[in-house]
Every structure is written in C-alpha cells, then in structure tokens.
From Swiss-Prot:
The gene is murA1. It is found in: Cytoplasm. The lineage of its organism: Bacteria, Bacillati, Bacillota, Bacilli, Bacillales. Belongs to the EPSP synthase family. MurA subfamily. Cell wall formation. Adds enolpyruvyl to UDP-N-acetylglucosamine. This is UDP-N-acetylglucosamine 1-carboxyvinyltransferase 1.
C-alpha cells in the first residue's frame, strides 16, 4: 500500500509547472469519437489514471488510441465503425465515462452505456444528461444497470433548459448536438473553462458552437467532423492547489501555467486573506508571510468558488486566526475530509452544509486517509505545516487527478516522500 509521508515545517520556494486539465481532457478525449475523418492528436495531456481509464473505454468502442506518455500526447482514430456499448468493466471506475453517450448517439444514433461509478462525492445524478438526450429525440430506458439510448430518426436540434448548470450534462449535450439536424440551444449551461475548451476543440474539428463560457450555448449541427491537433488547457484545480501550497507554508513560488481568469473566485479569496499574488503572462507568483485574515467561502457553480478547491482552501483556513465558515452547496458528502483533519487536531464543527472553523488550529502530524481526490491533496497541504510527521494513505484517489504532486512539492522544498509498504 502506497502512502505519502510529510514532515511539516518547510517553507516552499521555487517554480512549478501545471499539467493539462483533467476535467478538460476527459470530455475532449470522448469528443474525439465525433471525428469520422482523420485522427485527432491531443497534447498537454496529463499522465493520470483517469486518462488511462477513458482511453480503455474508447478502445472498447473500436477507436484506435495511442498514448504517448513521453510526449504528453494521445492520438485517437475513430474513423472506423464504432461499437455501441461501453461496458461496466471500465465505466464503473469513473463517472466521466458517461460522456461517451453523447458522441455515440451523434455518430451511431444509438448507445448502451453502463451506469457510471467513480467519485464518492454525493449522488451526482445523471438525470440532466438523460433530459437533454430525450429533448434531442432519443428514447432512453434503464435496464440491468445499463442506459439504453436510441434515436432511430436521428437527433434533432431543440431548446434545452438545464435545472442546474451541470458540467457533465452540458458537455454531453454539446457533443450530441454537434452532429444533430438543426440548431440546439442550451440554457442555464455550465460556464467552466473546460466547457470552453471542449467547444473550441469541436469548432476546430468543423463544429459550429457559440456562447461557451456563458449560460446560453448555441450549437448548429453539421454533417461531419474531422480530427485535429489540440492542446489541453492548464489544470486550474492543480494550479489552485499549488498556490495554496505556497500560501500555507508562507512561501514564495511561481506557478507556471496558472491562469487568473480561470480561477478568479479563488485568487480573490486568497488576496482577501492577505496572500500576495503577482499575475504574470505565463503564470502566477504566490507569496505569504505572517498571519492570514479569516474569510468565509461558499462553493457555487463557476464562476463561483469551485467545490473542487473547497477542501484545499479549508486546509489553508485552518492556519488563519478568527472565525471562518465553509459552506458546500454543490455536492453532498463533501466534508468527509473533516474527520481526517480532526485527527490532525483541527478545530472544525460541521452543521449541515456548513463547516465552522474556530481560531488557528495547531495542526499535528497523524495517520490519515484520503476520502476523495481533492481531500487527498488537502491532507497533504495540511501535512506541510503540521508539527511532526503526517502519513496519507488511499492514494488511488490522488492519482486520479494529480501527476506527481509529492515530487513537485519536494522540488519546492517540502520534506515529503512516497513510500510503497
């Protein structure tokens, strides 16, 4: 069993580079199934276990996938006739596998996708995906743990109003509608930078999508799409995690690839706390010293504070004086890391969807386990400043979303090792 062991107390200094965005590359890999002419080459692809999982799903669908890890590139050739079924064996490992349904419906007019697995955070229902596909003309039914979708007369453009700005549903509907007949309007669409990256990719392939990054997206269906080369945007969640690593240790680091516009709600909160940020063309420099100010945070869909940064921000808030409240509105069950923080002597009380942090916690090293992907990073951040040794287990969560996080922190001066027991 792998574990990461951290001895707290070292100030981080130096420069670190952000990988390509996990939450952009997964939908873009599935969108490569839309290209019936020429392969696509994706660059700046992070070497993550989730990327390998989605590549396996694409392979079962009869796409040829070449993963060039040394180049951080993946080539997807989906020009052959695709299989209609994405089996449970792979889909069960990761929720993002549901994103093959839109491209399969668009290309084949039918699809069978196992109900997804993956992250432990809340129920993450897929009703919005199904609502979108049905609006486009597909008949959907659930049977034996599979979603069966059939659009025997083809997909037809329509207007779809999402009940909630779901990222996955927005992506799936964009992909399905890109080859539908006529115009599709998605209202109350998700606005994340990863949505914009997906739309840009499909447009480069010959698609006609406007409005990505706003709450109304228009997709004019086209006859066919072709493969292209596309660079994945930097990972704003990894960038935010690294900015907090600099701030929590009261260090001075340059995070190359961090883009302010992709993480405005986070950087404004950091500045409110007294963290010094220097925005440069190719990244952000973070510096902090002394006491930080207390702030409250409330997670919201983009451009609000990202739920994927909630646990890391909580780690930083533990090192600030005063009363702080963290409110989680996006996912249920996203305070599972609190029990692990408490093992490190954190002063936190959870009441419903809010966690109350009283005063500056004198964090102590402890044995803790990651409960989900972002909690894994948050526990490592807390370990950077805890007194003594912290040991973090259940690292399969971490490997789903971070490339060599311990190595990057070590390069910046952390006393950190990954050990295989």
């Amino acid at each position: 069993m792998d574990k990461i062991v951290i001895k707290g107390g070292n100030k981080l200094t130096g420069e670190v580079k952000v990988e390509g965005a996990k939450n952009a590359v997964l939908p873009i890999l599935t969108a490569s199934l839309l290209a019936s002419d020429k392969p696509s080459k994706l660059v700046n692809v992070p070497a993550l276990s989730d990327v390998e999982t989605i590549n396996n799903v694409l392979t079962t669908l009869n796409a040829d996938v070449t993963y060039k890890k040394d180049e951080n590139a993946v080539v997807v050739d989906a020009t052959k006739t695709l299989n209609e079924e994405a089996p449970y064996e792979y889909v069960s490992k990761m929720r993002a596998s549901i994103l093959v349904m839109g491209p399969l419906l668009a290309r084949l007019g039918h699809a069978i996708v196992a109900l997804p697995g993956g992250c432990a955070i809340g129920s993450r229902p897929i009703e919005q995906h199904i609502k979108g596909f049905e609006a486009l003309g597909a008949e959907i039914h659930l049977e034996n743990g599979n979603i069966y979708a059939n659009a025997k007369d083809g997909l037809k453009g329509t207007s779809i109003h999402l009940d909630f700005p779901s990222v996955g549903a927005t992506q799936n509907i964009i992909m399905a509608a890109s080859l539908a007949k006529g115009k599709t309007l998605i209202e109350n669409a998700a606005k994340e930078p990863e949505i914009v990256d997906l739309a840009n990719y499909i447009n480069e392939m010959g698609g006609r999508i406007t409005g990505a990054g706003t709450d109304t997206i228009t997709i004019n269906g086209v006859e066919s799409l072709h493969g292209v080369e596309h660079a994945i945007i930097p990972d704003r969640i990894e960038a935010g995690t690294l900015l907090i690593a600099g701030a929590i240790t009261r260090g001075d680091i340059f995070v190359r690839g961090a883009i302010k516009e992709h993480m405005a709600s986070l950087v404004y909160k950091l500045e409110e706390m007294g963290v010094e940020l220097d925005y440069q063309e190719d990244g952000i420099r973070v510096r902090a010293e002394g006491e930080l100010q207390p702030v409250d945070i409330k997670t919201l869909p983009h451009p609000g504070f990202p739920t994927d940064m909630q646990s890391q921000m909580m780690a930083l808030l533990l090192t600030a004086n005063g009363h702080k409240v963290v409110t989680e509105t996006v996912f249920e069950n996203r305070f599972m890391h609190v029990a692990e923080f408490k093992r490190m002597n954190a002063n936190i009380n959870v009441e419903g969807r809010s966690a109350k942090l009283e005063g500056k916690s004198q964090l102590q090293g402890a044995q803790v386990k990651a409960t989900d992907l972002r909690a894994a990073a948050a526990l490592i951040l807390a370990g950077l400043v805890a007194d003594g040794k912290t040991s973090v287990t259940e690292l399969t969560h971490l490997d789903r979303g971070y490339v060599d996080l311990h190595g990057k922190l070590k390069q910046l001066g952390a006393d950190i090792e990954r050990i295989n027991d």
